[in-house]
């Protein structure tokens, strides 16, 4: 199809989108279950909640200077959805994948299929909703684009204890049995979890991660934000036991 340059609108030029085969239910595949709970920012010592929108500002407020964004306290609630594979035996340390920007509606089906085909081990998936907003000055940006192990600390000390308490699972402490996964800012967050805490995570799925300078506030140790990984951190440090 060759639409005229004088016409505005949407044009379907193909090819047709074909869903991945992992999204098609496998006949006879055992189905895991999911549990859901809510976390309140008031209960968090690590991420009590921020926003870049002034209390009297419009919802679509854009800070005038993204290199120095003012922030304001803001409470939030986040949903955590936990996938538990079929046949899981309570008390058994389970491999785990931590998924940013959760909950993910397709992941339980994908894991059912992959586990049934023996392509991945039976694992628990912890799908964590971000704290809201996006980019510099937002709670999501603080959690995901900060160049530190702070988010991994949050998962370890505040999320995992609730997962084990509320969902009746035991999470493995073996870093080889732990993975972090994310897209965009969630992608760099997944990598940072392993980079700063390789004793906790050794496997990473990072899709279209924001390896650019979105960190806010600026840290003098990593002034270029996510650029620091390919600019300085990876080439100037010993190889880490991380599979990406």
Question: For each of these PLM feature ranges, what is it?
Answer:
Residues 1-244:
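Non-catalytic cap/lid and distal C-terminal segments of serine-dependent acyl enzymes
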């Amino acid at each position: 199809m060759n639409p005229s340059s004088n016409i505005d609108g949407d044009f379907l030029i193909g090819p047709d989108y074909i869903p991945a085969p992992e999204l098609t239910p496998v006949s006879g595949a055992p189905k895991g279950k999911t549990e859901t709970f809510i976390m309140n920012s008031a209960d968090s010592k690590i991420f009590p909640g921020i926003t870049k929108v002034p209390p009297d500002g419009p919802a679509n407020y854009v800070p005038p200077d993204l290199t120095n964004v003012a922030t304001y306290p803001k409470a939030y609630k986040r949903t955590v959805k936990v996938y538990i594979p079929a046949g899981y035996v309570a008390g058994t340390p389970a491999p785990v994948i931590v998924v940013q920007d959760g909950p993910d509606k397709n992941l339980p089906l994908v894991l059912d299929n992959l586990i049934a085909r023996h392509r991945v081990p039976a694992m628990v998936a912890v799908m964590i909703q971000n704290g809201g907003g996006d980019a510099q000055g937002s709670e999501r940006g603080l959690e995901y684009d900060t160049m530190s192990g702070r988010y991994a600390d949050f998962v370890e000390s505040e999320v995992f204890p609730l997962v084990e308490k509320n969902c009746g699972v035991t999470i493995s402490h073996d870093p080889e049995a732990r993975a972090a996964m994310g897209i965009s800012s969630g992608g760099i967050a997944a990598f940072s979890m392993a980079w700063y805490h390789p004793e906790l995570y050794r496997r990473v799925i990072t899709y279209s991660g924001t390896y650019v300078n979105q960190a806010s506030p600026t840290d003098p140790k990593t002034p270029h934000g996510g650029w620091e990984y390919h600019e300085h951190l990876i080439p100037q440090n010993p190889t880490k036991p991380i599979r990406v």
